[in-house]
Amino acid sequence: MPTINQLVRKPRVAEKAKSKVPALEKCPQKRGVCTRVYTTTPKKPNSALRKVCKVRLTNGFEVISYIGGEGHNLQEHSVVLIRGGRVKDLPGVRYHTVRGSLDTQGVKDRKQSRSKYGAKRPKAA
């Protein structure tokens, strides 16, 4: 416990909060170009083939981004928009691709949570 005199000489310094999404540089989203589109397997105890892509951003960062939803149209040189948000069972994946924006199509036949997957409202039958 420091004395008041010690605190006067050298005040307490608050710890700086470290960003969970440094590549976004305080922006809500960033644009980038896919350099590789592939599948990877999650950590134990989960099992699947998760769709991810490596993206070179406009600021020069190269990050891995998760492609959510069923099916996608991304390939190398596709221009994508990424947002923050990690995938808990994929180490190193700290970003999500935004569906329905730029070259990324929305999810087909999506009825619920449509705004998260870039799907238009279905026509009333």
UniProtKB/Swiss-Prot annotation:
Example of a GO cellular component annotation carried by this entry: small ribosomal subunit
Region (Disordered): 100-125
Gene Ontology BP annotations: translation
Assigned keywords, A-Z: Methylation, Ribonucleoprotein, Ribosomal protein, RNA-binding, rRNA-binding, tRNA-binding
TM annotation in the entry: none
Positions bearing 3-methylthioaspartic acid: D89
SUPFAM superfamilies: Nucleic acid-binding proteins
Disulfide bonds: none
Segments of skewed composition (Basic residues): 113-125
Signal peptide: none
Xref: InterPro entries: NA-bd_OB-fold, Ribosomal_uS12, Ribosomal_uS12_bac
GO molecular function, one term: rRNA binding
Assembly and oligomerization: Part of the 30S ribosomal subunit. Contacts proteins S8 and S17. May interact with IF1 in the 30S initiation complex.
Annotated NCBIfam families: rpsL_bact
Function text: With S4 and S5 plays an important role in translational accuracy. Interacts with and stabilizes bases of the 16S rRNA that are involved in tRNA selection in the A site and with the mRNA backbone. Located at the interface of the 30S and 50S subunits, it traverses the body of the 30S subunit contacting proteins on the other side and probably holding the rRNA structure together. The combined cluster of proteins S8, S12 and S17 appears to hold together the shoulder and platform of the 30S subunit.
Family membership: Belongs to the universal ribosomal protein uS12 family.
PANTHER family referenced in this protein's UniProt entry, alphabetically: 30S RIBOSOMAL PROTEIN S12 FAMILY MEMBER (PTHR11652)
Name the UniProt record assigns to this protein: Small ribosomal subunit protein uS12
Biological source species: Dechloromonas aromatica (strain RCB)
Gene giving rise to this polypeptide: rpsL
